[in-house]
Amino acid sequence: MEELQGYLEKDRSRQQYFLYPLLFQEYIYVFAYDHGLNSSIFYEPANFGGYDNKSSSVLVKRLIIRMYQQNYFIYSVNDSYQNRFVGHNNYFYSHFFSQMISEGFAVIVEIPFSLQLVSSLEEKKIPKSHNLQSIHSIFPFLXDKFSHLNYLSDILIPHPIHMEILVQILQSWIQDVPSLHLLRFFLYEYYNWNSLITPKKSIYVFSKENKRLFWFLYNSYVSECEFLLVFLRKQSSYLRLTSFGAFLERTHFYGKIEHLVVCRNFFQNTLWVFKDPFMHYVRYQGKAILGSRGTHFQMKKWKCHFVNFWQYYYHFWSQPCRIHINQLSNYSFYFRGYLSSVLINSSAVRNQMLENSFIMDIFTKKFDTIVPIIPLVRSSSKAKFCTVSGHPISKSIWTDLSDCDIINRFGRICRNLSHYHSGSSKKQSLHRMKYILRLSCARTLARKHKSTVRSFLQRLSSGLLEEFFTEEEQVLSLIFPKITSFYLHGSYRERIWYLDIIRINDLVNNL
């Protein structure tokens, strides 16, 4: 990494113009390997002919030698089309090397954005906080802010989009023409490959073999979708922000600046609609939430501008039905595995003034989060832990494992699920999921040993109970021994948010 920074420090003002030569450097692929992505080809060599990590450097050197050859990419494309279903070595090497290049290319295109982020944090003197990376850090923010809001908009980022738009988005940041041509080559290659397997598959669906590159493109696309929100929010702010000028100096292409100028001039006349200091925006992956303390008319104006901006900027129908406006007091929204709502609690207070007494009704708002059982059962059914109705079944593909591995896998899933959903105010859904996983584990062991479930439950009842006893339950049993029994029966309503969760639970991610 130091060598990479030294290369870029030679000419920081023109660092975005010399990204393509980095593709011929061996340390770029080593750096991609060190990132530790599970989808990396270096971590899954079994899918590519049984190569191990020791031979990765040899493959990288062989790849660099081939890239120096003239018309290498043209030959690789022809080989991939001719031998796609034959299974010849030519197709194997072309497809394998193409994935290696995409891994290295993903590292290269991240360089300008990473350096810009680091310099921005240093300039604004923003301390690095790993706790803010936690998914659970979103919910305390919602509890503090959304309980005072009136309306909420559920926004689904529009898709699919044309592949050329993805290239054009990066063109405003990276002006290295060979790199953009290479990106276009990757997109069309994998689009043609996916179209032969599933004709209706869009480039929006990420390839398992190139997750890093496609996640980067998707994040770039989402940041462009949020451009209107950031632009209007900063325009309507009472105090001008220091980073506002960066958005006006952006380079736009193919005449689309004309649409933006028209929209910007039109926005100047309607900015009074958006002068709302209580506007809050939260997004995770493809779903966003926009909350406001204003009126329903203001939320409709926001929706209108979102739809028009996306339609003009991306030249496709932006699907207005993907934005739903609801009154927060009468609406529960599903976000990251939690069903959240604002509860209104009323309490009667008796006031005494001299000889007169009267009763006042006081209403308080509380942000509540619960775990819905139906999505969890549906997700568990997809993972083959239970039926659609929630009846536990055996995990047949795990019967070849040892008993210890089977119990550890089920226990780890149960602990992760309880850990992620520890912020729920009601624990009945978690206890039911724990029962499903525990009985599914017993059925898997019974199927492996060709025995009955009852015999295994009698033999391993205490062991399974300890394995499925979660960490927070153990802590609560030590701190509050008297309430542990109530907690196990679902009466404990204390919510716990963890600031070390940077990855969503697999059962929630399948929804």
Swiss-Prot record:
It is found in: Plastid, Chloroplast. GO terms for cellular component: chloroplast. GO terms for biological process: mRNA processing; RNA splicing; tRNA processing. This is Maturase K. The keyword Iron-sulfur does not apply. Belongs to the intron maturase 2 family. MatK subfamily. It comes from Ensete lasiocarpum (Chinese dwarf banana). It comes from the Eukaryota. InterPro entries: Domain_X, Maturase_MatK, Maturase_MatK_N. Pfam families: Intron_maturas2, MatK_N. The gene is matK. Keywords: Chloroplast, mRNA processing, Plastid, RNA-binding, tRNA processing. GO terms for molecular function: RNA binding. Usually encoded in the trnK tRNA gene intron. Probably assists in splicing its own and other chloroplast group II introns.
